[in-house]
């Protein structure tokens, strides 16, 4: 399915990728149904909590160095700015940059502006963002309130762009448009593809776009690519508008996360002919093998890739074998976004750990290049099937499963789910950094981190003795998926 570059907005994942938030079964069943078009979403008649696509769009764009955000909504819609500023400063710290806050203005829509329109507040917010931050571009993130009342954000953006002479770009990411918060990433990338990225002035055969979040693995990636005669261009966070505008000049695009990079990578390929490397994520041994080999094919560096793989795997072999011995027989549950979840199930297997259940916060039945996610296909091709479920961060389902299965370990990418198994006495590891388990060195570091969590579990043990969980015994006797409704026919 091609991306509609001419549209002002990105189609949500439910309509574009047939994404779902409700499922229980096995990975083989999931992939088989996705491939033949019979996979249906199962709604919940009870939902405890979720997230908002606006936060993903706003958070991702707010880390562009010389851009500003105008969030057109009620003041509460900017509550994410606390976490966004924390994340921004973490990234600045690992780069030894001066610490700054995110450059964001909220239009503070009130009852009056919701009833009579918020256009004047939006104009005021754009002018104030320009005056206060002197940005090279301003992104307007929308909210449920501004969308419901029909404020013409594009018309106001065009009007103010003429006035202040920099790009003023609508990012249509209001929360009610999608139940899948990753749709917010697509909204952000759509704004960049349609308004910021420019046609290439020249092609750079050594330049590789690297789509990521925080970028803590920059030195390792630079080292890897230098062995292949390539140079990474990291994006989108901590890039400038000028750097992003020239991403069409690269020889290829790679991503640390399929869920994140699919829209932008496929969009660059569709619009500018920059090949997007479509493969499993570069976590663990097989992930990095596949990632590098597909990159090598895209840029004609197959021999250099094979030479590097042989050398890198030889260096870690003794340590990896030792780690596997220590982790043999351990059982884990994984709960992450879909691309990370299905990749980390494989990574844990490479470390000698048996994954007894996998949870993903949603599932894309195909990516923008038309294929079922490569990580899911790879997992389904294994001899042993794995029970999995799809839930958009519903902790009541996660805790029910943990209570029944009682794994040795829980691995997640979000603190909101990692804290609960810790309170149940289960050792937990939060994969906050996207470069955890990245490549050959990363899997070694990840293995040691898991060993440490298993051997030093006194915090979880003591918490479990003192904390009463917010669910009564009745719930833990129920099927974890009691509130999943039947498939829509």
Regions found by a protein language model. Name each.
Residues 1-489:
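An N-terminal assembly and electron-transfer interface module characteristic of large anaerobic redox
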């Amino acid at each position: 399915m091609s991306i509609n570059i001419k549209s002002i907005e990105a189609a949500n994942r439910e309509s574009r990728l047939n994404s779902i938030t409700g499922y229980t079964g096995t990975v083989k069943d999931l992939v088989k149904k996705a491939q033949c078009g019979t996979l249906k979403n199962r709604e919940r008649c009870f939902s405890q909590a979720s997230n908002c696509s606006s936060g993903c769009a706003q958070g991702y764009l707010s880390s562009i160095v010389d851009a500003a955000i105008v969030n057109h909504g009620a003041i509460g819609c900017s509550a994410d700015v606390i976490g966004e500023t924390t994340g921004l400063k973490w990234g600045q710290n690992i780069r030894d940059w001066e610490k700054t806050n995110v450059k964001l203005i909220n239009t503070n829509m009130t009852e009056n502006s919701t009833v009579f329109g918020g256009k004047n507040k939006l104009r005021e917010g754009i002018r104030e963002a320009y005056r206060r931050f002197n940005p090279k571009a301003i992104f307007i993130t929308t909210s449920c309130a501004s969308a419901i009342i029909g404020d013409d954000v594009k018309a106001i953006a065009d009007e103010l762009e003429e006035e202040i002479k920099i790009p003023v770009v609508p990012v249509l990411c209001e929360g009610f448009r999608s139940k899948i918060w990753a749709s917010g990433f697509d909204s952000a990338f759509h704004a960049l593809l349609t308004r910021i990225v420019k046609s290439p002035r020249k092609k750079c055969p050594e330049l590789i776009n690297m789509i990521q979040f925080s970028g803590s693995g920059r030195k390792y990636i630079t080292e890897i690519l230098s062995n292949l005669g390539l140079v990474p261009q990291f994006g989108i966070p901590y890039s400038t508008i000028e750097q992003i505008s020239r991403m069409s000049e690269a020889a290829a695009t790679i991503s640390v996360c399929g869920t994140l990079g699919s829209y932008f990578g496929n969009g660059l390929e569709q619009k500018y002919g920059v090949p997007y490397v479509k493969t499993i994520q570069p976590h663990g041994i097989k992930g990095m093998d596949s990632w590098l080999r597909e990159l090598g094919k895209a840029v004609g560096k197959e021999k250099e890739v094979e030479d590097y793989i042989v050398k890198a795997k030889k260096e870690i072999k003794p340590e990896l074998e030792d780690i596997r011995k220590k982790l043999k027989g351990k059982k884990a549950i994984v709960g992450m976004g879909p691309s990370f979840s299905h990749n980390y199930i494989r990574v844990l297997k490479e470390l000698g750990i048996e994954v007894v259940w996998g949870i993903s916060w949603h599932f894309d039945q195909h990516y923008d290049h038309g294929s079922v996610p490569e990580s899911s296909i790879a997992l389904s091709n294994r001899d042993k099937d794995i029970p999995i479920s799809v839930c958009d961060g519903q902790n009541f389902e996660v805790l029910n499963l943990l209570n029944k299965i009682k794994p040795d370990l829980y691995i997640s990418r979000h603190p909101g789910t990692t804290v609960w198994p810790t309170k149940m006495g289960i050792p937990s590891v939060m994969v906050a950094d996207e470069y955890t388990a990245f490549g050959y060195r990363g899997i070694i570091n990840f293995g040691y981190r898991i060993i440490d969590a298993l051997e030093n579990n006194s915090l979880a043990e003591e918490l479990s003795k003192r904390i009463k969980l917010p669910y009564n015994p009745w719930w833990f006797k129920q099927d974890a998926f009691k509130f999943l409704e039947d498939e829509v026919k």
